[in-house]
Amino acid sequence: MAPSGGQEAQICDSETFGDSDFVVVANRLPVDLERLPDGSTTWKRSPGGLVTALEPVLRRRRGAWVGWPGVNDDGAEPDLHVLDGPIIQDELELHPVRLSTTDIAQYYEGFSNATLWPLYHDVIVKPLYHREWWDRYVDVNQRFAEAASRAAAHGATVWVQDYQLQLVPKMLRMLRPDLTIGFFLHIPFPPVELFMQMPWRTEIIQGLLGADLVGFHLPGGAQNFLILSRRLVGTDTSRGTVGVRSRFGAAVLGSRTIRVGAFPISVDSGALDHAARDRNIRRRAREIRTELGNPRKILLGVDRLDYTKGIDVRLKAFSELLAEGRVKRDDTVVVQLATPSRERVESYQTLRNDIERQVGHINGEYGEVGHPVVHYLHRPAPRDELIAFFVASDVMLVTPLRDGMNLVAKEYVACRSDLGGALVLSEFTGAAAELRHAYLVNPHDLEGVKDGIEEALNQTEEAGRRRMRSLRRQVLAHDVDRWAQSFLDALAGAHPRGQG
């Protein structure tokens, strides 16, 4: 079990600091501790865009990463002593935060993913509010703050990531006023009237105001935060509009000025572009088309299995296009890759059952023996296999009901150096603000989604190349390194030491 808060606070109040000038604080470490069949443990690299985005910055700046190592720690397994202190893994300094089964159930599956996640995604599923979940969220956030405090050198920069850790900035500010603290939210920040439903709304805003810079994907999220800061905490806030990577908002709290900005995250587009040109990837893409029966058109969906992603919307649209004869069943297929997600949360279990029932219905109605019209895989795909699917597909379907950014859309574009393919993209993704030459659709308008898919399937080669060239220009110019650098530059200017 993790030490009590009192013990850790004593450590943090001492005059000893860590030696890391730059600290990332995230729910997960960039590696997971895995138990092997013989009972021993090993570290395995975590997939994910956050690791890709921040690892180069960590390496350049003598960085450390604070996060959960991916195993539940209930104090019964003595071989988890490896988690007792900092770990050097592939030349990165890692500081594990130990979480018990109860912590995961209440802080992560409970408050983070059954309260905050649905609230921040426009209440597609009703948020659940439980006092014990909130209490655990506070407790775990305190442990993350204390771990960050121990890792950070005097005057270091600490970058806190995402909705699971919204109380950490204030907690860390109280422990270590010498630090420069940034926070970035990777999911949408909700409209004011929705956020006001939250019983602990003031505490969340106060937690975020502990940062020197609070970042969102879009200007709208930044504006909502400024309004709530003024209404709930009484900050004196700027009244002008917030721009993208410019025209920052400000909230004045006592003697401190908190900068608020919009920083749309991106992907490592150069690396994806390079990988997609690889001869082996190209060969695998051709094999995929052969394995699918060499259809004329392949539509692709790649998502975590989440109710925000609109998987059911695209399947229903495809089913109706088949029924209406606007798409031919013998030359068009859908491939849906659905990565398992939060499988112990009831709403996710229900979603999986619903999607698999929907796939079965479509294949039963329109497929043939040995030739389904929907190919559905409920498992993660290795990176190279995923890139091959991007290269092989003719239309990428990205239809979330709400999404902070959606990096899959940008990954697809980065992989299409051949200027082939088409992107059908929900207006309710952050990416839609940048990828204006996609086929933009409203996922709540089924007829509009059907029209968008049909238009993408039937585009001329010239029109498709023109659209994809424009999309690639945007994605290749605004990559993940530019995102991280723009945030950190703004953070350096936000702290009093950088103002002068």
From Swiss-Prot:
* Cellular component GO terms, alphabetical: cytosol; peptidoglycan-based cell wall; plasma membrane
The protein's enzyme class: transferase
The UniProt entry, under Pfam families, shows: Glyco_transf_20 (PF00982)
For binding UDP-alpha-D-glucose, which residues are annotated in this chain's numbering?
Answer: G48, G49, R304, K309, L407, V408, A409, K410, E411
Q: Which InterPro entries match?
A: Glyco_trans_20 (IPR001830)
**Per its Swiss-Prot or TrEMBL record, what regulates the activity?**
Activity is increased about twofold by 10 mM manganese. ADP, at 10 mM concentration, inhibits the formation of trehalose-P by 70% with either UDP-glucose or GDP-glucose as substrate, but GDP, also at 10 mM, only inhibits the reaction with UDP-glucose (50%) but not with GDP-glucose.
- Pathway membership: Glycan biosynthesis; trehalose biosynthesis
Q: Where is this site: Involved in alpha anomer selectivity?
A: W117, I187
Record field: catalytic activity: ADP-alpha-D-glucose + D-glucose 6-phosphate = alpha,alpha-trehalose 6-phosphate + ADP + H(+); CDP-alpha-D-glucose + D-glucose 6-phosphate = alpha,alpha-trehalose 6-phosphate + CDP + H(+); GDP-alpha-D-glucose + D-glucose 6-phosphate = alpha,alpha-trehalose 6-phosphate + GDP + H(+); TDP-alpha-D-glucose + D-glucose 6-phosphate = 5-methyl-UDP + alpha,alpha-trehalose 6-phosphate + H(+)
Function per UniProt:
Involved in the production of glycogen and alpha-glucan via the TreS-Pep2 branch involved in the biosynthesis of maltose-1-phosphate (M1P), and probably in the osmoprotection via the biosynthesis of trehalose. Catalyzes the transfer of glucose from UDP-glucose (UDP-Glc) to D-glucose 6-phosphate (Glc-6-P) to form trehalose-6-phosphate. Is specific for the glucosyl acceptor (Glc-6-P cannot be replaced by either mannose-6-P, fructose-6-P or glucosamine-6-P), but any of the glucose sugar nucleotides can be used as glucosyl donors.
Q: Which PANTHER family match?
A: BCDNA.GH08860 (PTHR10788:SF106), TREHALOSE-6-PHOSPHATE SYNTHASE (PTHR10788)
- Tell me the protein's name: Trehalose-6-phosphate synthase
Organism (species): Mycobacterium tuberculosis (strain ATCC 25618 / H37Rv)
